[in-house]
Amino acid sequence: MAIRVTFTYSSYVARSIASSAGTRVGTGDVRSCFETWVRPRFCGHNQIPDIVDKSPGSNTWGPSSGPRARPASSMYSTIAREILEEGCKSPLVLGMISLMNLTGAPQFSGMTGLGISPFKTSSVIPFLRGSKWMPCSIPATLSTDIAEVDRGGKVCDPKVKLELSDKVSNGGNGWVNKLLNICSEDAKAAFTAVTVSLLFRSALAEPKSIPSTSMLPTLDVGDRVIAEKVSYFFRKPEVSDIVIFKAPPILVEHGYSCADVFIKRIVASEGDWVEVCDGKLLVNDTVQAEDFVLEPIDYEMEPMFVPEGYVFVLGDNRNKSFDSHNWGPLPIKNIIGRSVFRYWPPSKVSDIIHHEQVSQKRAVDVS
């Protein structure tokens, strides 16, 4: 069975060689191929194969026939012996190496002299596709059509396209941006826990919790904010700042503790006149248009002067806030810090700074 398969395979190779060379293989050619390659390999196990004759008149492919005799390629015979370590000197192996030399050489002067056109490896052995299994044959960017022969003998022409991008990610697409753009609730909570633990009771910032609804809709009950303590060392508190402060003396006199902390928004600074009339807040006779207030004020307040060293504070929820309209201006020295960032809950993480400039107040003069 093995001899039959080997003979059939050898005949197929011989026909392929002859077909590529433009010559039809006949019975004599197949027999010659069998005598030259197959028989010495499989029928002469007890005989040492003849060493290829290196004389000028010898022919590797068959018996010498005068002027058509081709000189043997000693170089490829030597390579074959070196590769196989003298273990196999079969004409079949040497012939295959010579065949590889013919198909891969840049010039085919020996074959063209015999009137045989050059041929490709893929036409000799269809199932050996060098352009596919050779890694070096795939360029960086490739778009080509390759005809394939599958095991069923069907020919297909798929479109094979390989594209390698040469774009290099810059620093702007690194882990910093990923961290800033992260939207996971767990990640925000973890980041908040680390940040607050570092800033807790420090000289730079202090976390605080909102205990009431006096700052709605800006801050809700249970929200937690970070108050920074640095900016007021370099400047005075400004209008629209949300400040955290200790209970002023007037509240301490009425039973509050010095440790009690409040959070309100500054609406007027020292030297201003503040009043509430017809549901509107007026500072220096100017109506204040405040987008963070949801409803008109339902109380009246006579004009009040803010002395030096004081500010006037109100809650954003004007009708439900215990603030300066009840107990008067707030001493600046009682201010602990400015609330700048809400870190809890994670779904509402944001800054709470009012970015409206004091010089660009949306105020309307009273006519």
UniProtKB/Swiss-Prot annotation:
Places the protein is found: Plastid, Chloroplast thylakoid membrane
Keywords annotated in UniProt: Chloroplast, Hydrolase, Membrane, Plastid, Protease, Thylakoid, Transit peptide, Transmembrane, Transmembrane helix
Record field: transmembrane: 185-205
Catalysed reaction, written as an equation: Cleavage of hydrophobic, N-terminal signal or leader sequences from secreted and periplasmic proteins
Top EC class of this enzyme: hydrolase
Cited PROSITE patterns: SPASE_I_1, SPASE_I_3
Function: Cleaves the thylakoid-transfer domain from a chloroplast protein.
Family the entry assigns: Belongs to the peptidase S26 family.
Protein name: Probable thylakoidal processing peptidase 2, chloroplastic
Organism: Arabidopsis thaliana (Mouse-ear cress)
